[in-house]
């Protein structure tokens, strides 16, 4: 397996610290609002990578944090007239609802920054003792010039970064690029007691501390959105490696943006759609399909047309599953014969191809193409003359390859199936009664819902089409 490491800017063979195990940290949301579909892509991408690692046999310890104290949260809590903790509790609950709806698996641990204040204070104290941080009027800053490799993640030296960075001017800092690891309390802000007076942690120190506490000094994979490379991830490296003297993360993975009209989707531009809004119109399968239809390091556009296309594509894949489900109930032969066993064995090439694509830096776009090739093969070769065992095993393979992508796991909608069966029986009765107008109306109504009826020797069958 090869992964693209942002740190080295090249693909590298993936070798975990402990054979068969992966320690993975993903920067999670700041819980002051519903997350938008751009954030959703990041969560879906790294959920998919986690799923695939598990599919390949790795035991994954997956940590994704909640930032539950920062300026945005303080301002939003004040606007709503509630405490910062109440705001965090509210939107963590909303996050889980939307993430569950998107089939994003729960993390092994979802730490909240406010649960690790004691550890963060200790971390800051040790940075000061090591000479990498200094206190000014209750604030504590990290001294970037003390860390030789600062800028390595984004491939720039400190001077170049200073020229291009948007940095807050504070004459108390020794260098403009120095950043806060502890912030002195301002009026009306929540605070915790510390050796430097009441205050709260800086954003970057939270992730460094929680990653170290939950995963150790060195982790296998650290991941997040492309916008976090600098300054957030750069600062995490500086803090963590200054303290431990060890490599913080062996592999850095970053997911590209989602664009609307070729501009990055963001709350600041007010061009975003929340995941919940999109889920009202589209299934999690369709949304995940769109988000994974391009390589995770390549930006994708978000449009209704592309979502509709993703919906149609997912329906094509489910059509194969639905046909196999119907065939299982209709075929008379139960067990596979020798020819069917040979055919089933021939399908292994799709599994091998799927793994080959995903092993190449998690190329979901090409892996999805393999799924379409598999279902096309099955549609052309599994029919009413096949055994129920072959139908079962073919369906199992389609679902198996869909699982790492978080798609094709739903069962046939029984309510829909029952409704259609009732309409078919009503149509049959209308034809017996020579009420052809009613029979045609039922057929046309179903057709308008992309449901086609087929007359077979075993009776009327239905299937969904694009």
Swiss-Prot record:
InterPro entries: Cys-tRNA-ligase (IPR015803), Cys-tRNA-synt_Ia_DALR (IPR015273), Cys-tRNA/MSH_ligase (IPR024909), CysS_C (IPR056411), Rossmann-like_a/b/a_fold (IPR014729), tRNA-synt_1_cat_dom (IPR032678), tRNAsynth_Ia_anticodon-bd (IPR009080). A motif ('KMSKS' region) lies at residues 264-268. Zn(2+) binds at residues 27, 207, 232, 236. Its cofactor is Zn(2+). This is Cysteine--tRNA ligase. Coiled coil: none annotated. Its main location: cytoplasm. It comes from Clostridium beijerinckii (strain ATCC 51743 / NCIMB 8052) (Clostridium acetobutylicum). It comes from the Bacteria. The keyword Disulfide bond does not apply. Binds 1 zinc ion per subunit. It is found in: Cytoplasm. SUPFAM superfamilies: Anticodon-binding domain of a subclass of class I aminoacyl-tRNA synthetases, Nucleotidylyl transferase. GO terms for molecular function: ATP binding; cysteine-tRNA ligase activity; zinc ion binding. Belongs to the class-I aminoacyl-tRNA synthetase family. ATP binds at residue 267. GO terms for cellular component: cytosol. GO terms for biological process: cysteinyl-tRNA aminoacylation. Pfam families: CysS_C, DALR_2, tRNA-synt_1e. It catalyses: tRNA(Cys) + L-cysteine + ATP = L-cysteinyl-tRNA(Cys) + AMP + diphosphate. Monomer. Its EC number is 6.1.1.16. Gene3D superfamilies: Cysteine-tRNA ligase, C-terminal anti-codon recognition domain, HUPs. Keywords: Aminoacyl-tRNA synthetase, ATP-binding, Cytoplasm, Ligase, Metal-binding, Nucleotide-binding, Protein biosynthesis, Zinc. A motif ('HIGH' region) lies at residues 29-39.
């Amino acid at each position: 397996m090869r992964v693209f490491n942002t740190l080295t800017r090249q693909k590298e063979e993936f070798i975990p610290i402990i054979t068969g195990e992966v320690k993975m940290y993903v920067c999670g949301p700041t819980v002051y609002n519903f997350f938008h579909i751009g954030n959703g892509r990041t969560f879906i991408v790294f959920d998919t990578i986690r799923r695939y690692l598990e599919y390949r046999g790795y035991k994954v310890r997956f940590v994704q944090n909640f930032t539950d104290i920062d300026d945005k949260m303080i301002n939003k809590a004040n606007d709503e007239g509630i405490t910062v903790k109440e705001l965090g509790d509210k939107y963590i609950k909303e996050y889980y609802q939307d993430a569950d709806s998107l089939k994003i698996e729960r993390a092994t641990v979802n730490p909240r920054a406010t649960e690790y204040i004691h550890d963060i204070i200790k971390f800051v104290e040790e940075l000061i003792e090591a000479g990498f941080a200094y206190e000014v009027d209750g604030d504590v800053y990290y001294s970037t010039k003390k860390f030789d490799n600062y800028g390595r993640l984004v491939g720039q030296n400190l001077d170049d970064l200073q020229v291009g960075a948007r940095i807050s001017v504070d004459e108390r800092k020794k260098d403009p690029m120095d950043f806060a690891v502890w912030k002195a309390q301002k009026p009306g802000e929540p605070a915790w007691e510390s050796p430097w007076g009441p205050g709260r942690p800086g954003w970057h120190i939270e992730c460094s501390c929680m990653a170290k506490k939950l995963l150790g000094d060195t982790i296998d994979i650290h991941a997040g959105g492309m916008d976090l490379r600098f300054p957030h991830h750069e600062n995490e490296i500086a803090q963590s490696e200054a303290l431990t003297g060890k490599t913080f993360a062996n592999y850095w993975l970053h997911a590209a943006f989602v664009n609307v009209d070729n501009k990055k989707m963001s709350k600041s531009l007010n061009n975003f759609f929340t995941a919940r809004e999109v889920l009202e119109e589209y299934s999690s399968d369709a949304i995940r399909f769109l988000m994974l239809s391009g390589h995770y390091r390549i930006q994708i556009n978000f449009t209704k047309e592309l979502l509709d296309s993703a919906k149609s594509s997912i329906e094509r894949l489910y059509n194969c599953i639905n046909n196999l489900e119907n065939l299982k109930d209709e075929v008379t032969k139960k067990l596979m014969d020798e020819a069917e066993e040979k055919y089933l064995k021939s399908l292994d090439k799709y599994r091998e191809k799927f793994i080959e694509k995903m092993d190449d830096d998690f190329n979901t776009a090409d892996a999805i193409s393999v799924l379409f090739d598999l279902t096309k093969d099955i549609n052309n070769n599994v029919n009413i003359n096949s055994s129920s065992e072959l139908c079962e095993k073919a369906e199992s393979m389609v679902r198996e390859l869909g699982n790492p992508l978080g798609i094709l796991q739903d069962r046939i909608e029984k309510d829909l199936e029952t409704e259609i069966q009732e309409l078919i029986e009503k149509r049959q009765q209308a034809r017996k009664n020579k009420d052809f107008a009613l029979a045609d109306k039922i057929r046309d109504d179903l057709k308008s819902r992309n449901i086609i009826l087929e007359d077979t020797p075993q009776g009327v069958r239905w299937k969904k089409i694009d």
